[in-house]
Amino acid sequence: MAGASVKVAVRVRPFNSREMSRDSKCIIQMSGSTTTIVNPKQPKETPKSFSFDYSYWSHTSPEDINYASQKQVYRDIGEEMLQHAFEGYNVCIFAYGQTGAGKSYTMMGKQEKDQQGIIPQLCEDLFSRINDTTNDNMSYSVEVSYMEIYCERVRDLLNPKNKGNLRVREHPLLGPYVEDLSKLAVTSYNDIQDLMDSGNKPRTVAATNMNETSSRSHAVFNIIFTQKRHDAETNITTEKVSKISLVDLAGSERADSTGAKGTRLKEGANINKSLTTLGKVISALAEMDSGPNKNKKKKKTDFIPYRDSVLTWLLRENLGGNSRTAMVAALSPADINYDETLSTLRYADRAKQIRCNAIINEDPNNKLIRELKDEVTRLRDLLYAQGLGDITDMTNALVGMSPSSSLSALSSRAASVSSLHERILFAPGSEEAIERLKETEKIIAELNETWEEKLRRTEAIRMEREALLAEMGVAMREDGGTLGVFSPKKTPHLVNLNEDPLMSECLLYYIKDGVTRVGREDAERRQDIVLSGHFIKEEHCIFRSDSRGGGEAVVTLEPCEGADTYVNGKKVTEPSILRSGNRIIMGKSHVFRFNHPEQARQERERTPCAETPAEPVDWAFAQRELLEKQGIDMKQEMEQRLQELEDQYRREREEATYLLEQQRLDYESKLEALQKQMDSRYYPEVNEEEEEPEDEVQWTERECELALWAFRKWKWYQFTSLRDLLWGNAIFLKEANAISVELKKKVQFQFVLLTDTLYSPLPPDLLPPEAAKDRETRPFPRTIVAVEVQDQKNGATHYWTLEKLRQRLDLMREMYDRAAEVPSSVVEDCDNVVTGGDPFYDRFPWFRLVGRAFVYLSNLLYPVPLVHRVAIVSEKGEVKGFLRVAVQAISADEEAPDYGSGVRQSGTAKISFDDQHFEKFQSESCPVVGMSRSGTSQEELRIVEGQGQGADAGPSADEVNNNTCSAVPPEGLMDSPEKAALDGPLDTALDHLRLGSTFTFRVTVLQASSISAEYADIFCQFNFIHRHDEAFSTEPLKNTGRGPPLGFYHVQNIAVEVTKSFIEYIKSQPIVFEVFGHYQQHPFPPLCKDVLSPLRPSRRHFPRVMPLSKPVPATKLSTMTRPSPGPCHCKYDLLVYFEICELEANGDYIPAVVDHRGACMGTFLLHQGIQRRITVTLLHETGSHIRWKEVRELVVGRIRNTPETDEALIDPNILSLNILSSGYVHPAQDDRVFFGNDTRTFYQFEAAWDSSMHNSLLLNRVTPYREKIYMTLSAYIEMENCTQPAVITKDFCMVFYSRDAKLPASRSIRNLFGSGSLRATEGNRVTGVYELSLCHVADAGSPGMQRRRRRVLDTSVAYVRGEENLAGWRPRSDSLILDHQWELEKLSLLQEVEKTRHYLLLREKLETTQRPGPEVLSPASSEDSESRSSSGASSPLSAEGQPSPLEAPNERQRELAVKCLRLLMHTFNREYTHSHVCISASESKLSEMSVTLMRDPSMSPLGAATLTPSSTCPSLIEGRYGATDVRTPQPCSRPASPEPELLPELDSKKTPSPVRATETEKEPQRLLVPDIQEIRVSPIVSKKGYLHFLEPHTAGWAKRFVVVRRPYAYMYNSDKDTVERFVLNLSTAQVEYSEDQQAMLKTPNTFAVCTEHRGILLQANSDKDMHDWLYAFNPLLAGTIRSKLSRRRSAQMRV
């Protein structure tokens, strides 16, 4: 085994965070034991290969089959070396490599079981093999030592007493060793593990740019492993001693890479020095052991520099000496570390050539002791020869003592013999001889020490370590873990009493023996206690601790000159002795309590009944004590101040009351004067024009009823409003369908009309907000326009409101834009998954409503049992099946019949009807039942609620059943048959319905039949018409569609306390039955499996965007009605900068740091409790129509910790800010885009923001980790020539840190500021892009004119991208209204049929039972009822309903009808047509004809369905759909030179007539309505890079960084710039490309971009780059250019 080479292994680690952030590439490849490295700077260079004993590939994850784990590394290296140790050899394993390469991880690892390194695994395996030994003649002992080499100094990591640096000495026999290094005996692996943890804690580590926990020292873990074998035959014990050295080296580093400065730089220099020496030693040993040099003579250069470094000196035996050595070279795989990695490989390759001459260390102690004794004899003879023989006796006395005992004895003897020192000093060589003698005696004593003595010494050191920690106030558990911290038991100390302990840096300070200095960190002399603050001097005071008689320590406080120091509230100027419990104040804010444990203990012994203070001694106590000593009475001062404030408040309140009263009187006088002036101006004119009043016409009762009926009908007429909604929203519906087809969502959208009827009640989410307000006053049910969403993939149908469609459409557009950049495979996978985040899909329930049925309860009045067979009607009026229900009155204890499989309910449901609103409902003829709880059991009580429309509120051709209207047309409406029969005095109710008694009846759900097989799992639930709590439900039944009917046989007993409202309810109101089933007939069955398939992870993830909030309501501005905007006059793109400035120490307001990462596009990093200002800067192109006048108000509110906000809630935290300044400013240097003068307009305003005024905890506290605070800001800015202020709204994202926190700049910010091209403050802003639209004010006119001017143009004719894929699909229009009328008629007839069937069934039952019934149930009454019910009026939506036949109209009535007809057939007036809509005469006739067809009830539905307005009118959709999106042959927006005769109105406004000149001068007319909308920045980047810009009349080209996010191009100063400096709207700009122009200007690769305000010439780096930019700016133009180039090349090739 002797002469073996060093085992060398290399191991490559994964990328760290630093390398991943720089997108590093792997340059290391491993194949077997061969390692190859590639030069990233010269890829064509041949890779360098190295061969080692082991090559470990740990770059990938553990799932990789080639991954080398910690276990594998130990199995290959550690187990072999441990085996050598058991054989008796010295063993060494050390790790080598650059910093952060993974050396410590390989050697020491982590705490996890599978992450442990070589050292823990080797120790565990060592004791495992020891414990597995069964030979009784073998005994083992293990000693460990742990040291670190820091800055060429050795420190003991196991003994806390060895705080100083240890000396490295060299013995002729032992070689280099560390003097006084602790060697602790261990008996188990747990002991070693505890020692390793204790040694790793004080080890020196620090953070660098390369590694967050960089080892700043070399660590050497030594194990002395002794094996004793007792030979029973010879009675001889032999020993084998092995030394196991496990070395964790610090990594080599470069100062520029690690960013080392100061102490880190000094540490790195020492690390590099020792590693350089190690490299020299390895190289020298490799050269000595190499073949060619063996036969040569030893040269001077063969000297091996072991002594140049402490590391190599201690490892001398392990490098080419008596040791079995293994080296692990740790490698970094990143290309940025190529040089360091190549150097490591070369050193490892040289280390392979080193050969070590290892020998078995057998019986070393006997030989060593003999040689040491000979050396002692020789040294003693040397002393005798020099005349120092009397020292021999002293030395003999020390033999056999422990090293510590011998040293103490020698010291005491030397102190007593003064002449001995003189003799030693003057004797030549005597001092060296004595030193060597001491050294030898220490070694002999250590060798003679028994194993038990070593264990006792180890335990004593452990006790000393725990005692030292206990004295410092650290409590330890028995297993060595930390238990807690307590006050020291002996040492005097200072306890911090500050409210904020961070102000005084530490909670507790120790006062050491001697002098303890207190001062600032920048003092010339080093201070023991360092404090900071304005009133702390460089050397503030001194604590002097002296020991007096009896061992008592006395602490004296000595203040320095000019330092403010107080003890118990008194200022100290001379040295003062401190007593335990004294309060010490240094400066103004540092408050401490002095504690002296020994002194306090003695005082308690002297006075055992010492009084405790009445209040705790804390910071407040010390401050009050200081004020009292200074003669300041805070209580009296506060009372005086409070009295002054009260007096001031009283005076100001009286003054304000007086001023308010005076102002009120002034306003009243002014109003009276104005009123008199108006009366005098108008009354004479009115009197002159006044005609003689006509006699009041007396209407008959029939005429009043007719007028009331007509008024009510036309008030709730909905035809025109429904048509407007259908026409105005058609373009949204078309776009949604087009996107659905292109994204293959299999979802279709179509308009649908929904009416709130009994058979189709509207869910709350479809009702508009004002529905709840007018529900009580509305006589007809509400009809709304909704969107029917047919999810063909999942077989589901949903209904959306129009507002929800618009919201979802925004998300669809984003998904469509993203899909253009995502691979098609990913898009298809996205289609197969239904998630909550997909805007096309909604969650759908398992059960679907089949239909509803109604059962009336009037048979309970007689009472007779009835079995009803009622139709199950769907919301569309289709009969889906039939339901058999039995209703009968029963006694309270009657049992339910046995139906076999029927279900018997466990108890009787108790219902309570309240009469408190009965008189009100009786007067209104509305059978609405009010409910309240009675005294019955709350567990079984069910409440019927009385809110909502009447039970028969569905639309009907016959208003007989509405029961909600007090005004009816004569002979047109009548009460229902049942109600007519049963109306009468309630006092005459039958005996079974006595008021106050309990009435019990039974409802039995028998069977359901004729339900289609497409519905499975049928169940039924029923409830009272107005109840909204839990319904009565049956169990689900399987439905096959064949065989006998479904038998529910569900019995429910209901007990009611008879009240007037209950009797009124059973007279006219039904019970509603709802039948549900699982719809199992899927439209596309093969797609079901795709829906459940998991989505593969997308290769691209787009950032989450913040929602756009609505403006925060203004607090100071009066509520103004927004005027109706007319045609758009002009549009501007606004670039807005938002800054939050914080007050700095120098008094300036500096913009707060902004982190531009994340979905918020900018997060403000703010400090807690600092004054702030908000600065807003507006940038836009200079134009004549946009002039900012002043900022009316700036409001902030909606404080929240989520991006979303509930805008419906009233925010109490809205705050109006104080505007400090506003006006036009000059652009900053960094905001300029071009070299010339920036012609853009910069308008800036600033406001003070006190976040504490919001009274919000989110703004007052420090933001928790991973949380962000959101706030909405709205600025109301007044503009010239505008009717109202423009509103700019922005959502802020903020994070609050503590006041003194140092904000770490993000990586992007560091890159930005480190480049030196931009100032730090210029990047600390958040940008927003807005679109300003200035529209003309639409003239109000008369109500009739307003109706004719309503924007009812059909938007379905506007072109939408992708509508070619709709295959002729068109949104429903006017025909939908007529079809919905037929559905309502059908529902009304079905309802009448059910009522009549119930009436006939009840009458037949009464006749068969011979019960006397009311007269009205006779056949004559029935016929009369039927005749009267057949003459009802139509529903409020019907245009065909007419009152009953009347007498012939007179002349006045005919004139009124003709006038109404003219108004209905009137077209747009000439003014509106000329000013806003370019429409021809023929088109006007077409529109007139269409309106006529729509209003003519004689036309067929097919004719009415062809309603379409002119397709040449401009689109009414603003924002996303401009004028170019609609097919307009002659767009008339913004003509170049308008003709006076075509625009008379406009000319009159521009040049007012002389008659109205005075009025114009008095009050200028404002014509425009501003509208500012924030533009959501697209996450899709079409292209980004540098472009050169050239503007006319500028100095030269400007290089700018451009990012294209359609439809905008954003320009930055550089790629490190985070703030947009210029925005170019590509949708309105014109891109021009000309090869002739390039040749003429001699500027290749250029193209021009022209806007309304400027023209820019852009130059790309290459021809290909230019075409890429053209494609990003204008894809159609780029395609045209490429097509021309292709044709040109083809022609050239043919030639």
Curated annotation (Swiss-Prot):
Binding locations of ADP: Y67, G100, A101, G102, K103, S104, Y105
* Its membrane topology: Peripheral membrane protein
Any one annotated GO CC term: neuronal cell body
- Which tissues show it? Expressed almost exclusively in neuronal tissues such as brain and spinal cord (at protein level). Expressed at lower levels in the adrenal gland (at protein level).
EC?
5.6.1.3
Domain of life where this protein originates: Eukaryota
Q: Which Pfam families does UniProt cross-reference here?
A: DUF3694, FHA, KIF1B, Kinesin, Kinesin_assoc, PH
Q: Which reaction does it catalyse?
A: ATP + H2O + a kinesin associated with a microtubule at position (n) = ADP + phosphate a kinesin associated with a microtubule at position (n+1, toward the plus end)
GO-annotated molecular function? ATP binding; microtubule binding; plus-end-directed microtubule motor activity
Q: Where does ATP bind?
A: G102, K103, S104, Y105, S215
Regions that span the bilayer: none
Q: Which ranges form a coiled coil?
A: 366-383, 429-462, 622-681, 801-822
Renumbered to this chain, region (Disordered) spans 1410-1451, 1524-1564
Q: Where is the PH domain?
A: 1580-1678
Complex and partners? Dimeric motor; dimerization is required for ATP-driven processive motility. Monomer in vitro. Interacts with PPFIA1 and PPFIA4. Interacts with CALM1; the interaction is increased in presence of calcium and increases neuronal dense core vesicles motility. Interacts with PPFIA2 and TANC2; both interactions allow the recruitment of neuronal dense core vesicles to dendritic spines and decrease in presence of calcium. Interacts with SYT4 (unphosphorylated) and SYT11; both interactions increase in presence of calcium. Interacts with MADD.
Protein name as annotated: Kinesin-like protein KIF1A
